Amino acid sequence: MTFLIASNILLWIAFLGVTVVMLGLMRQVGLLHERSSPMGAMITDHGPDIGDMAPEFDLPDYFGRSVHIGGASERPTLLMFTAPTCPVCDKLFPIIKSIARAEKIGVVMISDGAPEEHARFLKNHELGQIRYVVSAEIGMAFQVGKIPYGVLVDGEGVIRAKGLTNTREHLESLLEADKTGFASLQQFMASRKKNAA
């Protein structure tokens, strides 16, 4: 009888151990899934299409300086839709600055939210040449559903690339899309397949 009780207790301990290990594995798979983002910026099918003229806006930035979005400009402009409370946007900010310098493009960060959140965000980040605009209207015109979201507009005001930009690779894929003429990595791969056939 004592043997049966001891074996039953050992089985329950083993069962609980396997359960703990399984929960740990599930957590690790979840973290791995979260970290392995898709290659290239994920394009949503909402808003103006690639190749369309970008909607035009003339409005003040956070500091009251005039900003023109869309239409002809001296250089390409990256419109980054962000939020002051978005942790991914916070991580991307130095990357956006470095890419803007390296690629010699203009950057307009477009955000929405409470004034105190913007003040806190701007207190912690040096903008440099980046313009910071608070406008829900622009986000609605581009039909941005998730952030951070990037739209690359060329010097003639045409949308060259757009997509969800969670990592440096996603941001760089927007610029590569403009350089190669392919709107997305998927379009590039499809053209290679077509040429090979």
Swiss-Prot record:
Give a yes or no for keyword Ion transport in this entry. Answer: no
Organism equals Paracoccus versutus (Thiobacillus versutus)
Role, per record: May be specifically involved in the processing, transport, and/or maturation of the MADH beta-subunit.
PROSITE patterns linked: THIOREDOXIN_2
> What protein name does the entry list?
Methylamine utilization protein MauD
Q: Name one GO biological process term.
A: methylamine metabolic process
Name all Thioredoxin domain ranges. 48-180
> Which Pfam families does the record match to this protein?
AhpC-TSA
Instruction: Tell me the superkingdom of the source.
Output: Bacteria
Q: Which UniProt keywords apply?
A: Membrane, Transmembrane, Transmembrane helix
An annotated Gene Ontology molecular function:
antioxidant activity
Pathway(s) served: One-carbon metabolism; methylamine degradation
From the UniProt record, report the name of the gene that encodes this protein.
mauD
The record, for InterPro entries, names: AhpC/TSA, MeN_DH_accessory, Thioredoxin-like_sf, Thioredoxin_domain, Thioredoxin_ResA/DsbE_sf
- Membrane topology annotation: Single-pass membrane protein
Instruction: Name its cellular compartments.
Output: Membrane
Membrane spanning residue stretches: 3-23
